[in-house]
């Protein structure tokens, strides 16, 4: 018989930098998960993506064991990296802070594809373009 899931915890953690301090410790501790075991596993799986924020979805079972699924980095993080800016615009409709090319947009959409609710790459590109627009980043041809 399958184990019963008692909680699903969603966290956004910098790759390779999971440690038992807040916010990770308290989020896992209240469900009785072995925090160090999670941190070691997460850091091992994300070692190749160092410096990027990698969201994770942790399923905690009734016997306090856990499994986790790594998601793709947030579109905003990928867009900021591609545009070479620190943060998005505070007034995206008035002031633009940077721009990305159509090729960069397609690359980001390709990366995000598994986590997006899109059937093809064009739809994924539109979703990512909308995120970029809301950050004050223009898309050039």
Curated annotation (Swiss-Prot):
Pfam families: Ribosomal_L11, Ribosomal_L11_N. PANTHER family: 60S RIBOSOMAL PROTEIN L12, LARGE RIBOSOMAL SUBUNIT PROTEIN UL11M. It comes from Trichodesmium erythraeum (strain IMS101). GO terms for biological process: translation. Belongs to the universal ribosomal protein uL11 family. Disulfide bonds: none annotated. Keywords: Methylation, Ribonucleoprotein, Ribosomal protein, RNA-binding, rRNA-binding. GO terms for cellular component: cytosolic large ribosomal subunit. GO terms for molecular function: large ribosomal subunit rRNA binding; structural constituent of ribosome. One or more lysine residues are methylated. Forms part of the ribosomal stalk which helps the ribosome interact with GTP-bound translation factors. SMART domains: RL11. The keyword Ribosomal protein applies. Part of the ribosomal stalk of the 50S ribosomal subunit. Interacts with L10 and the large rRNA to form the base of the stalk. L10 forms an elongated spine to which L12 dimers bind in a sequential fashion forming a multimeric L10(L12)X complex. It comes from the Bacteria. Signal peptide: none annotated. This is Large ribosomal subunit protein uL11.
